[in-house]
């Protein structure tokens, strides 16, 4: 057995606050690690941690409107981790707080934000690397790649989900596997960051969900439902069809920022749902597969796309993913082995689906495939590679 992220199982029959408190106590180190990581990332954009918390508090009302139980649950998370509610809110609103272009051109604002963070006792972890320039290229790198296969495209007649989560390697120690439940008792398992409600995971009913970050020109402009709250809400759904209904309801409250949510269910259906403050749409499978990276594919949302850096690898990774999906057209149906090969694809070097850390970039700022995840909703099975997938095995955790 290789290293695996800590597994936290929440006790049965707890109130929202008690669930959060138990989660917070069990993941206090990971939540505090996340706070330090994101305080520095926000500061790079000219946003101090105090300012980030103030921005996050604007989302309280819309979160309560969607699910009144989540605010007391987050208060419990904060108390358990020896943090404040606004800290937990800021972590769960991190996609909305980061500006659409991620990196501010105002270096003076970044410097002031760093001074404010230092005064709060928040360490600058980039000083262990290259200080001033350590994070400069982080925002130009790509992020996650996903591939979902429906019942017609799979080797066993069931839908499969796969994704690499690419981010700053520093966040790997903050990852945990959480098994919890909502106010109606519907259980779920999620691979998430300390201090965050949910990320990639599966509901007890057999809906697998993931996340590819997108950037919209209207991200964070008005308080809509935060992306990570959307993910937690969808983990109460049992199917792709039910997720569509949930997204239609969330749209009445508006989405806080853009993301793509790849999904697969126990009945064999898959899709990708692109969400943004301007609306949402669906990418349907072609020849049994749906592939996504980090730019909008739906024509109806093309005007939402924020400009991307020239070095962003979203398009090369999409092409690589489509190459794997094309095997279905040639009669080569996709199963567990093929999805492992997909998530370990290094054919495009540092722009690959499986991203190894770039040795030319300071260690603390390297974007890499932090983890890989494969899910089979039919059997509620989850496999996780807790490092760059090329380096480790996929271990079954559920």
Predicted regions: what is each one?
Residues 2-134, 140-142, 237-273, 277-398:
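C-terminus-biased signal that marks the final domain/tail of proteins
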Residues 97-228, 370, 382-384, 390-392:
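Internal mixed beta-strand/loop scaffold within catalytic domains of large alpha/beta enzymes
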Residues 230-236:
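Short, well-ordered beta-strand elements within core beta-sheets of diverse protein domains
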């Amino acid at each position: 057995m290789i290293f695996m992220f800590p597994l936290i199982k929440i006790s049965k029959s707890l109130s929202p606050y008690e669930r959060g408190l138990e989660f917070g106590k069990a993941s206090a180190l990971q939540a505090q690690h996340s706070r330090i990581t994101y305080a520095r990332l926000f500061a790079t954009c000219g946003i101090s941690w105090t300012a980030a918390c103030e921005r996050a508090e604007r989302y309280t009302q819309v979160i309560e409107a969607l699910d009144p139980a989540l605010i007391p649950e987050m208060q419990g998370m904060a108390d358990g981790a020896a943090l404040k509610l606004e800290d937990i809110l800021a972590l769960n609103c991190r996609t909305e707080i980061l500006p659409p272009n991620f990196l501010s051109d105002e270096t003076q604002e970044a410097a002031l934000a760093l001074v404010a963070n230092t005064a709060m006792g928040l360490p600058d972890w980039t000083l262990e690397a290259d200080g001033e320039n350590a994070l400069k290229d982080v925002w130009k790198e790509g992020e996650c790649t996903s591939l979902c296969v429906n019942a017609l495209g799979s080797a066993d007649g069931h839908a499969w989900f796969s994704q690499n989560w690419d981010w700053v390697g520093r966040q790997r120690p903050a990852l945990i596997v959480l098994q919890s439940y909502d106010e109606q008792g519907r259980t779920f398992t999620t691979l998430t960051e300390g201090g965050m409600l949910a990320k990639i995971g599966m509901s007890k009913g057999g809906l697998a969900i993931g996340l590819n970050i997108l950037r919209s020109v209207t991200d964070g402009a008005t308080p809509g439902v935060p992306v990570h709250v959307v993910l937690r809400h969808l983990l109460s759904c049992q199917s792709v069809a039910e997720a569509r209904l949930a997204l239609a309801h969330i749209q009445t409250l508006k989405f806080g920022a853009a993301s793509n949510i790849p999904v697969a269910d126990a009945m064999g259906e898959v899709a990708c749902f692109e969400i943004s403050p301007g609306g949402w749409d669906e990418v349907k499978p072609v020849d049994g597969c749906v592939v996504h990276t980090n730019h909008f594919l739906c024509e109806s949302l093309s005007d939402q796309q924020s400009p991307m850096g020239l070095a962003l690898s979203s398009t090369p990774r999409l092409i690589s993913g489509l190459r794997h999906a094309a095997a279905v057209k040639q009669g080569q149906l996709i199963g567990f082995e093929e999805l492992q090969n997909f998530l370990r694809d290094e054919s495009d070097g540092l722009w690959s689906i499986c991203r190894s850390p770039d040795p030319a970039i300071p260690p603390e700022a390297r974007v890499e495939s932090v983890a890989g995840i494969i899910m089979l909703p039919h059997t509620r099975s989850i496999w996780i590679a807790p490092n760059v997938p090329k380096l480790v095995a996929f271990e079954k955790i559920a």
